[in-house]
Amino acid sequence: MLQYRTDLAMEAHELLCAKSRAQTLSGVDSRTVFRRGCSVTSVRINTEGAARQLGKPRGRYVTLDLSPLQKNADDVLERASRAVGAELRALLGENVKSVLVAGLGNANMTPDAIGPRSAEHVLVTRHLRQNGAFSAFCSVSVLTPGVLGQTGIEAMETLRGTVRAVQPDAVIAIDALASRSLMRLCSTVQLSDTGIVPGSGVGNHRCPLSRDTLGVPVYAIGVPTVVDAATLTLDVLEEAGKSDVDPAALRGHETVMVTTRDIDAQIRELARVIGYGIDLALQPLDFSELCALMG
């Protein structure tokens, strides 16, 4: 049986709804609104049955389509950062006073570098809280654990030890994802309160990061940067009205990843959007103040 591969809950829901010819699935609440210049789709998986169908843990997934903002180059950084920050703040709630931000992925492989690059733009304040000028700030620490092939240590193991030492209220993990559609690459951001499996975007699944493994809530920020070749082929054929595809013709293509040719520039820009979005969600700063602090 041919299957699309996607890490986006919104896409998984769309695919199953199309297959069953339904508006939504039992056990799933989904709605799309337009705010702050972009469409925001919220998918809440309420039951274990729905979670199994979608292949995603129970919880809330919020997907922002930033493509309308990216067409206006004048203030795209500010508007996109504000949009991400507002949705993340709503997801976190009011009780998170200290956060560990984890930039997951391989900084040396561009499509997988969104986590480490975003972490560079997060305002670190844990060591400044004793200073009266920063007493109202959220305590934020940052870690980029690298990948198993570089360190010999699972990201989960590194983060679990750090969580025990730092004792944050929550972890925010940033990582690359896979999409079913080229149109969503580097233009979509998924936020969730369900944790994340590092490396899923590039097909290298590692130990999951979740409340069960780290002991604190784990919020995930994911950006689709790749499409696997088999999924891309299925998507293109579907658009062309071809549904009778021989599964044998696609065998072996699941290990081939496709990304955009300007991925370096895309990651560089999106990393600032994600990093600044986290800062705006956590700190009592407006965008101009944040830019002054971050240089």
Regions found by a protein language model. Give the residues of each.
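N-terminal amphipathic/basic leader segments beginning at the initiator methionine
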Residues: M1-R58
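An N-terminal, well-structured beta->alpha segment
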Residues: G49-E94
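Conserved active-site and cofactor/substrate-binding residues in soluble primary-metabolism enzymes
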Residues: G59, D75, R79, A83, ...
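Short glycine-rich or small-residue beta-strand-to-loop segments that form or flank ligand, phosphate
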Residues: T63-S67, S98-M109, V142-G146
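Gly/Ser/Thr-rich loops at beta-strand to alpha-helix junctions
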Residues: L104-D112, G149, A176-R180
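Glycine-rich phosphate/diphosphate-binding loop of Rossmann-like nucleotide-binding domains
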Residues: N106-C138, V142
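A structural-propensity feature for long, helix-poor, extended segments
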Residues: S135-V163, Q167
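A structural signal for small-residue-enriched, beta-sheet-centric alpha/beta enzyme cores
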Residues: L143-T144, A173-G295
